[in-house]
Amino acid sequence: MLINKNLKIGIVVEYNPFHNGHIYQLNWIKNNYPNSKIIIVMSHKYSQRGEIICMPFWKRKLWAKKYDVSKVLKLSTRKTIQAAHIFAQNAIQKLNKEKIDILVFGSESTNDSLMLKIATFIKENKEIYNQTLKKNLKGGNSFPKANFLTLKELTNEDFSLPNDILGFEYIKQIVENNYKIQPIAIKRSVGFHSEEPSDEFASASLIRKMLKDGRDVSKYTPVDLKQIPTKLLIENTFLKFKKYILKTPASKLKKYLLVDEGIENLFKKNILLFDNYHDFIDACVSRRYTRSKIMRTYLCILLKIKK
């Protein structure tokens, strides 16, 4: 652990919404590094998974400042709605420019030393890593699945939990670019997409689900949240999206960010069969395309973000 001088400590966040788990993380930093300056890089309007964030940026920034965050950096939509390794690259680059000393992230396993060891192994054995990854991609696997299988094959380690995936990608960026940043994983209060609360903690996805169901979330967040405004529910964009897909040739859809590997044809085929967002997304998910990939690509077309 670094000597507690006036350190700069970075966190990659979405705060979708801001809740007690985030307060726990910020308090942990303040307790362990009382003289530190906390710098966060926060997604703007949309999450890495391709959903609309349920609190406006300014409000999330306000709550972060209330809990002693010194500086809030904005991660643009283009840089946010990317696969984990590209999202991590964009976020860590931004924090490195701020000359942070430590990166803190929540993790299911908290084994940052093992993650560092494996990231170093990958850097030193790029050829065999890339060959194995290519083999697993050719087997019809999505990139995250192929990456997971490759790591399992080469190191016999399992990084399949959502926050371990992101945490590992952060560490890979630090190692690959020789950033002078010490990564520290702290135990998450609840799982990333956990459907069960724990004492005063609930995952952001569970809080959003509770808000949609009209349930009280005051036990899990200091923010006065009663419901998610309809304009911030991604499912309410489906009619607009459907009209656009129906009238737009596949060749034009290919010009949008993340539209590759024939995904434009898949969208054209399935759009005729479904009348709501969730059924459409479900139908597009396959061994080749993860749910997150489909959701992010949907958003790129909806927002007309070009390559």
From Swiss-Prot:
The keyword Cytoplasm applies. ATP binds at residues 12-25, 106, 163, 188. GO terms for biological process: tRNA modification. GO terms for cellular component: cytoplasm. The lineage of its organism: Bacteria, Bacillati, Mycoplasmatota, Mycoplasmoidales, Metamycoplasmataceae. This is tRNA(Met) cytidine acetate ligase. The keyword Nucleotide-binding applies. Its EC number is 6.3.4.-. It catalyses: cytidine(34) in elongator tRNA(Met) + acetate + ATP = N(4)-acetylcytidine(34) in elongator tRNA(Met) + AMP + diphosphate. It is found in: Cytoplasm. InterPro entries: Rossmann-like_a/b/a_fold (IPR014729), tRNA(Met)_cyd_acetate_ligase (IPR008513). Catalyzes the formation of N(4)-acetylcytidine (ac(4)C) at the wobble position of elongator tRNA(Met), using acetate and ATP as substrates. First activates an acetate ion to form acetyladenylate (Ac-AMP) and then transfers the acetyl group to tRNA to form ac(4)C34. Belongs to the TmcAL family.
